[in-house]
Amino acid sequence: MQVKLFYTLALWAPILVSAQLSGSVGPLVDFKTKAKNKTCDITDYGAVADGKTDVGPAILDAWGNCSTGGLIYVPPGTYSLATDLELKHGESTAFQLDGVLARGHEGSYQLILVRNCHDCEFFSGNSQGAVQGYGYEYLQDGNYGERLFRFQDVSDFSVHGFAAIDSPAYYLVFDTVSNGEIYNLLVRGIADLGMTDAFDIWGQNVWIHDIEVTNGDECVTVKSPASDFLIENIYCNLSGGTAIGSLGTGTNISNIHYRNLYMNQADACYLKTHNGDGIVKNIVWENVIVHGGPYPLAVNEAWGKDVGSTGVQVQNLTFRNWYGENTANSRPAIRIECDEDVPCYDITLDNVNLWTEDGDYVEWSCANAYGSGACLQEAKDTGDLATYTTAVTVTATPSYSATHMPGDFTTNPPSTAPFTIPPMPTSFYPGATPISTLLSLSGAGGL
């Protein structure tokens, strides 16, 4: 198990963590202090936990009174949310979701938008809070609805402790965020439809850890621009997997560290571009277990629609301590195919052991990629890299043992009925203890 170095300076202080982070993450003031300053219980503003009455106006009124220096409290119970929420301009605020917000209408873009918020925390105090999207009502017919969450222009923040269930589209989007901690979260939904990304994140200095995802598209995905991310203890349990991209013009991604990734029928690395421009550099994927997935380790610079321009420069990627297998040997277990106009370089595969669930050989495919390991060519001078394409057939079975998680799904969840909200998981990677324990508060702020 990879040793993690972290220090808690005080109950109310942000956390300092090692690896790729560039500074402290999390709220500047703890939720208990905010609750002592002022608490706005939504039932005092007319909210009724009957699963029918729209709770939106009560939440907006509570936010208006407590969004500066206070805590908004959603007590246990099921509340119908028939209003798209825009929670904006929060300053030193906390939102404690101990009940269930159930989508009660056909909305437009996202059910809950948190924007322009500094020193804020969105969390469940009893670790039983959830947002129920009833996405099956759309998805069973091949249609899509609104996203569940968007956090936009948020800094010095944390999001933790609740479940996002059955979204009609994307689950959680983190748009231009900084100095954040995202952890102890569960995403559970239909696993056979795209456009249902669980976590799409771009920004600076973000720690994502202890996450479980079941969905039909990407699990934890880094978008551009992004820098100084630590992503660890990730359990993609029937999902598209962890990815970077897709990328376009002006790409700027650097200093991203993935570690302790567990993939059940999911891909651990899919870096995808098709032309575009800019740079991706200094990325590490280490301590990875893959059980199934079409492309467990893939860099594909001819993916999807051609967005024009000269190509994205990809450099200094490290893949270390990988174990597992893909679903079919008709697809390369290792695929590193870079743009012929801007070849990749400084790519390192160190102790990568990937086999297949189907057959007695695997393929490796490399194109215009330089470094060490698999089918990569060595570069003597990165200033003048020739184009090439090569494929290697491997028949020698690697010697390794890759643990299975007891919670692995073997069949897709049903797509024609509401999801039961499961309890929060307590394990996200074999042998790794979650970094932060689940909260078990009673009442607002645990006071």
Curated annotation (Swiss-Prot):
GO terms for cellular component: extracellular region. It is found in: Secreted. The keyword S-adenosyl-L-methionine does not apply. It is an enzyme of class 3 (hydrolase). Its main location: secreted. InterPro entries: Glyco_hydro_28, Pectin_lyas_fold, Pectin_lyase_fold/virulence, RHGA/B-epi-like_pectate_lyase. Gene3D superfamilies: Single-stranded right-handed beta-helix, Pectin lyase-like. Residues 1-19 form the signal peptide. Glycans are attached at residues 37, 65, 237, 252, 316. GO terms for molecular function: polygalacturonase activity; rhamnogalacturonan alpha-L-rhamnopyranosyl-(1->4)-alpha-D-galactopyranosyluronide lyase activity. Keywords: Carbohydrate metabolism, Cell wall biogenesis/degradation, Disulfide bond, Glycoprotein, Glycosidase, Hydrolase, Polysaccharide degradation, Secreted, Signal. GO terms for biological process: cell wall organization; polysaccharide catabolic process. Disulfide bonds join 40-66, 219-236, 338-344, 366-375. The active site is at 217 (proton donor), 291. Pectinolytic enzymes consist of four classes of enzymes: pectine lyase, polygalacturonase, pectin methylesterase and rhamnogalacturonase. Hydrolyzes alpha-D-galacturonopyranosyl-(1,2)-alpha-L-rhamnopyranosyl linkages in the backbone of the hairy regions of pectins. Belongs to the glycosyl hydrolase 28 family. This is Probable rhamnogalacturonase C. It comes from Aspergillus flavus (strain ATCC 200026 / FGSC A1120 / IAM 13836 / NRRL 3357 / JCM 12722 / SRRC 167). The gene is rhgC.
